[in-house]
């Protein structure tokens, strides 16, 4: 090997090392920019009045022998013409067992309150139990707003013919508060799936019961990017979740507790606080 050849090899090695070092420096993250979360969760207030309706008055069967989805939906529809930023509609579900044969849609300025001992049971094979309506078809956070779901139990009740489903789904909206709710029995989906929502509070809830082999979270935070990631919530404009507080919940007998398994390049979840939750008998990952 000539002197010129040795010199060239040494020079090439030095250049390669310099390039490698430059690459490392380019991708180093400045952790001093992290300032902590500013999450406050859902902000639902300012009502000057409220109207209360009872699902039994619309024909719901609290013994669970017949379909109550039409009756409950009629009660929820009351908010379309009667709810506003100044008037909240409280929909009461008394103690009992209510069978639903199709999904429910909830509108802006609605407080869906299930009394102690009230259980809503899914009795169909495809689709979620409840989702927010999309009255105006807006993207971003511009669809429904100010929705509260409190108390009771939502039983996914999967059957041998069930397709993967989420118990609850919410997207393109602002201010969602889920409080003191038991959500159980999911098949290959999420107990609560949330995409493109700003202002989220989930507290004092109990998530449990999962069948299937998919590695799904009980609570999934998502972006609304395409029909594979978050179907049926057009427009697909990459809206992420922002300002989420998930606290004091119980997760058990599940594969995963909470998290996200999708992302969009350059789009980030912001202001998320996860605090005081308990996880036990998890076969996969807590968070």
Listing of model-derived features with the role each one plays in the protein:
Residues 100-103, 122-127, 158-166, 187-194, ...:
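Short glycine/acidic-rich loop motifs that flank beta-strands on beta-rich extracellular proteins
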Residues 2-12:
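Bacterial N-terminal signal peptides that target proteins for export
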Residues 73-81, 99-108, 123, 138-139, ...:
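Short, T/G/N/S-enriched strand-turn elements that build extracellular solenoid repeat scaffolds
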Residues 21-31:
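Sec-dependent signal peptide cleavage junction
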Residues 115-118, 145-156, 174-185, 198-211, ...:
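Right-handed parallel beta-helix
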Residues 12-22:
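Bacterial N-terminal signal peptides
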């Amino acid at each position: 090997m000539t002197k010129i050849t040795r010199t060239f090899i040494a020079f090439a090695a030095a250049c390669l090392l310099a390039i490698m070092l430059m690459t490392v420096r380019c991708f180093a993250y400045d952790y001093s920019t992290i300032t902590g979360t500013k999450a406050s969760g859902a902000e639902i207030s300012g009502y000057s009045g409220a109207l209360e309706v009872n699902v039994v008055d619309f024909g719901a069967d609290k013994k669970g022998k017949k379909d109550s989805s039409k009756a409950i939906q009629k009660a929820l529809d009351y908010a379309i013409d009667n709810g506003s930023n100044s008037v909240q509609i409280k929909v009461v579900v008394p103690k009992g067992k209510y069978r639903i044969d199709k999904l429910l849609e909830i509108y802006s300025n609605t407080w869906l309150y299930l009394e102690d001992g009230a259980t809503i049971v899914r009795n169909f094979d495809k689709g979620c139990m409840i989702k927010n309506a999309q009255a105006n078809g807006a993207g971003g956070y511009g669809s429904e707003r100010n929705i509260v779901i409190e108390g009771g139990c939502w039983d996914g009740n999967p059957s041998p013919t069930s397709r993967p489903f989420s118990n609850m789904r919410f997207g393109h909206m602002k201010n969602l508060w889920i409080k003191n709710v038991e959500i159980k029995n999911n098949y290959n989906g999420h107990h609560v799936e949330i995409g493109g929502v700003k202002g989220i509070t989930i507290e004092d809830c109990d998530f449990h019961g999962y069948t299937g082999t998919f590695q799904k979270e009980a609570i999934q935070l998502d972006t609304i990017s395409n029909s594979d990631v978050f179907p049926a919530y057009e427009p697909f404009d990459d809206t992420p979740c922002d300002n989420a507080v998930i606290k004091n919940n119980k997760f058990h007998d599940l594969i995963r507790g909470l998290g996200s398994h999708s992302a969009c390049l350059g789009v980030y979840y912001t202001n998320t606080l996860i605090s005081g939750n308990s996880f036990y008998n998890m076969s996969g990952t807590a968070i």
